[in-house]
Amino acid sequence: MQFLASLVSFLLVVWSVKATALPVEDRLSVHSNRDLTREREEMILKMISGLLDGSDNSLFGGEVTSMDIEEPLENKLEERAAYNALPQLPQRDRKAPCKNFFWKTFTSC
């Protein structure tokens, strides 16, 4: 949300700098198109308000429900329970097989 607010303010600053940097003839055309720029600003504000109203969760991958958060936690708890249910093996056997970091170490491959 802060990103969108900063983006809008940045765009307005860039637009105002662009308008003041134009020669006099171009400034007149900018003033004549003031109605169009107001419509553009209103359109931008409507788009941003639409993003911020309720669909901002869809920007980050959809709505996050409590079930989505609980499922990985339950999976981790099940994995821990399964790990603890195994007979207690020595540390060497519990490690992943085939991790031979040194040439003299034991591997269970």
UniProtKB/Swiss-Prot annotation:
Classification via PANTHER family: CORTISTATIN (PTHR10558:SF1), SOMATOSTATIN (PTHR10558)
Cleavable signal peptide: 1-16
Primary location group: secreted
Any GO CC annotation of this UniProt entry: extracellular space
GO molecular function, one term: G protein-coupled receptor binding
GO biological process: adenylate cyclase-inhibiting G protein-coupled receptor signaling pathway; regulation of cell migration
Keyword Electron transport: no
Function: Somatostatin inhibits the release of somatotropin.
Organism: Protopterus annectens
Alphabetized Pfam families for the sequence: Somatostatin
Record-stated family: Belongs to the somatostatin family.
Protein name: Somatostatin-2
Record's subcellular location: Secreted
Record keywords, A-Z: Cleavage on pair of basic residues, Disulfide bond, Hormone, Secreted, Signal
Disulfide bonding pattern of the chain: 98-109
Pro-peptide positions on chain: 17-80
InterPro entries recorded: Somatostatin, Somatostatin/Cortistatin_C
